[in-house]
Amino acid sequence: MCSSDLEVFYQGKLCNAATVLQENGLKPFSMRIREGLSVTNGTSVMTGIGIVNLIYAKKLLRWSVAASVMMNEIAASYDDFMAQALNEAKHHKGQQEIAAMMREWVAGSKCVLQRENELYNQVHKEKIFEHKVQPYYSLRCVPQILGPIYDELENAEEVLINEINSACDNPIVDPDTQNIYHGGNFHGDYISFEMDKLKIAVTKLTMLCERQINYLFHDRINGILPPFVNLGVLGLNYGLQASQFTATSTTAECQTLSNPMYVHSIPNNNDNQDIVSMGTNSALLAKTVIENSYQVMAIQFMGMAQAIDYLKIQDRLSSKSRQVYEEIRSFFPVFTNDTPKYKEIEMMIDYLKKEDK
């Protein structure tokens, strides 16, 4: 079915749908009875958006694990915060899974420290430890922060799979009993609720990312890097200072967008539809939050690449971190001069979306 007055976006332009199909040798999809109504009145659209959201959110989580390990390598942190015994003391699957993922990623790294080797059998006479005994939460509490996000994404996957294998039509025809059941299987509350939870989870992931960026860029906090990872002339060049403004404002936007749609409902249709799910709105807002998160994470990976070059620790990284560093440097070379970075951010986003670690 393709009416002559229907329009579609094709290659970034609004075009006549029939013309686009003809030019590409495609035939219009022929819908059967009730299929069109199901697409517009059921949960199909919101569920489809939700599944795409889930795919990109899961990839974000894996990248956040990678970034968190690389941050701890840069900071030369103690590795016991990701220890199996420590994280199994909390009976949450997500926390344990994140810690296990971090241990796998950090394997072979010469950057992280073992507390038993550094502190247990040595006499320390200094009154103030130069190296923090317990790093900042954004470095040390990663399993506890990303763990609930892992659990939520697992739950979202279960809900979405249940939904796409469900009948969201109304009424439901049962040929076995020869009954027609009038109900509300079109209602999208499951998807709306799950997309709200997903966007809250991704916002928290983005907040962690932003705090790690702040650690990376704040020389008085990290104590080992120049301000804003500036590899140029201090006082003359800016490093990634301007990019931090983008990361901070984008994270703030995510926080505002995290207000749930699930609890918003405006009656319509002569009050027949007196309480609705707003599920498509929820899914679209979650999509925006995810896109924002990729932008913030892109800036973090740019900063980490600069930091690794400044510290000259390429050969001490874990094999996984070294591979990511080299892949990034293949399209984002080290820089010292002040130039616009929006193209590099876009390239980094494209890399993060295409690669799967």
List PLM regions with ranges.
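C-terminal auxiliary extensions adjacent to catalytic cores
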Residues: S4-K357
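Basic, glycine-rich
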Residues: M1
